[in-house]
Amino acid sequence: MNLFGFLSLTAILASQTQPLMFSKLIGNGSAKYLIVHADDLGMCHAENEASFKAMEAGLVTSGSVMMPCPWVMEVVEYAKSHPNVDLGIHLTLNSEWKTYRWRPILPPEKVPGLVDPDGYLWRSVEDTLRHASAAEVEAECRAQIQRALSLGLKPTHLDTHMGTVVAKPEFLDVYLKLGKEFGLPVMLPLSMLENGNYTTPPQVKQLLPKVVEAGMPLLDALAGGVKSTEPGERRKEYISLLRALRPGVTQIILHLGTNSDELKAITSSAEARYGDFLAFTHPETRQQIKELGIRLIGWRELAKAFKAK
């Protein structure tokens, strides 16, 4: 083999072992792209109302819907009247709150490992990992996707509530499989697969070759770790995150809520959720994004690149 042939073969082999990055699919790999994402739509009215307002204000570029939750039909109606809204499916395998609970889409007897003794989805990721099989996870996640489609939603992507579908290698396998089956990109950052995160055990890193083999593009990173619940301080922390963004495609995950008795009755994180809403409807945040040269994008743009690859 001559030198040219050797170099060509080396390049081919390298491309087969390197993950496909969204930043390469959508254009300039040196640019800073940011998805500002609203999680937990459908959970309650306060979550929906704040998310809709923030998306209409222009800084929140996408969201995802919890199909088993009580307020999902409000999201369906909103999507009908706002056909350009960028919504994915927030694959939901947990029901974490103390008194406000939801069940799987499938009858509990068909997915017994997913439900607690009261018939609700387990509160913790650890309980789901302990009791549920990959087959049950696949069946329920597929049912959630099919439910969304049957209601007329046009999902742009899949992602995960509480990280459960990426917390175990067998579950991550299901996540990739369903993404390919339904032609939807899945939310996976390279930084998580390389370094782990709060739900991801070390063995998930071993699945990076499977992600490469599946041809599923990756985000570069998730940006998070905001601690303060006081609205002004919370906004400052988000601005610090914006200033620290690196080139590539990064996602910030928000949990937005209105300052309502409903949300306060559901969760102790109500103040932080209202803080997220205030931070990403605030003129200072918009100005910082502009000054930093950050390009806001949504999952619809990534989905188009995914389907065209």
Protein language model features and the residues they cover:
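N-terminal pre-catalytic segment of deacetylase/amide-hydrolase enzymes
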Residues: G5-S8, I12-I35
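Metal-dependent polysaccharide deacetylase catalytic core of the NodB/CE4 family, i.e.
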Residues: P68-C69, K80-A167, P189-N195, G224
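Structural preference for beta-strand elements that scaffold enzyme active sites
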Residues: Y33-I35, V60-S64, N84-H90, P155-D159, ...
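Histidine/acidic-residue-rich catalytic or RNA/ligand-binding cores of hydrolases
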Residues: E47, K98-R101, N197-Q206, T229-R235, ...
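Catalytic domains of cell-wall/extracellular-matrix polysaccharide-remodeling enzymes
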Residues: A134, E138, R142-V212, M216-P217, ...
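Acidic (Asp/Glu)-rich catalytic clusters
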Residues: K24-I26, S51-A57, E74-D86, R103-D116, ...
